[in-house]
Amino acid sequence: MNVLAIGCHPDDVEIACAGTLSKCVKRGDKVVVAHLCNGSLGHVVIPPEELIPMRANEAREAGKLAGIEVIGGVFDDLDIYSDNAESRNKVVELIQYAQPDFIITHNPDDYMPDHTATAKLVFDAAFTATLPNWPSKTKKAAKLVPIYYMDTLAGV
């Protein structure tokens, strides 16, 4: 199976569903993790220009250890919008690239605006990615797949 986990920030997917993704890797699945934002505002002391490469490197190294392909953030923190065609197109291209059998992303009722925007973008892009005539760089339509929400806030 091909598994695509799309989180907003570097560490969101890793915190919320690393165990699930580890099981997927162990059974032989191809797992791709995509962070939509670069984590630029994720620290109160370290400035964005230092933090962005640090978090990207941490994500890459974690991916190597886990046998997971990691795709880095394309937006700054709090600069991701679910009603923006450019944002949706970037997520469509991620989905078409990964050709997933299922997608994991944030709960649409999350507390953080970046997370809810990510959930909405993934939901909308998952359908758009199936359209064979959609003008994307990949030019490879994906199939319509289930979307599962990761949520550590509501409890298990």
Explain the meaning of each model-derived region:
Residues 1-98:
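Active-site rim/loop-helix segments in enzyme catalytic domains that contact anionic ligands
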Residues 1-6, 82-156:
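Metal-dependent de-N-acetylase/amidase catalytic core
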